[in-house]
Amino acid sequence: MGERVVILGVGLHPFGRHPEKSVGELARVAALGALKDAGVEFKDIQAGFCGHVVQGVGAGLRTFGEVGLTGIPITNVELACASSSRAAMLAADAISGGIYDLAMVIGVEKMERVLLSGVGGAEEIGRAHV
């Protein structure tokens, strides 16, 4: 079994309607809070994992770029409601396996009125009452 993995810090942007803010701006508030909580700096982060649903191709790169973390490997995770938890699991696996010592996981979504219409299979899931 690999090394023990812990969550050093957490951050959260207050929930609510924020039409004036980009996804990256929302993520930055949470990321800065997590760094402060953990007592680490941006330069300490070796990899980023971004969980989202409908932010599109390259969402992790854009989000981490707006947060201020560039030049590190970024993994995008698009797995519907399990996106962010899977991103955390992937980060933990990478740390446990000795690939990284410190990674940041960002779970981000900006809900729109037409959100589920853009998710492939949403109608089928609804019909199946899942």
Where are these regions (language model features)?
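Conserved "HGTGT" condensation-loop signature of ketosynthase/thiolase-family condensing enzymes
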Residues: 1-74, 93-97, 108-127
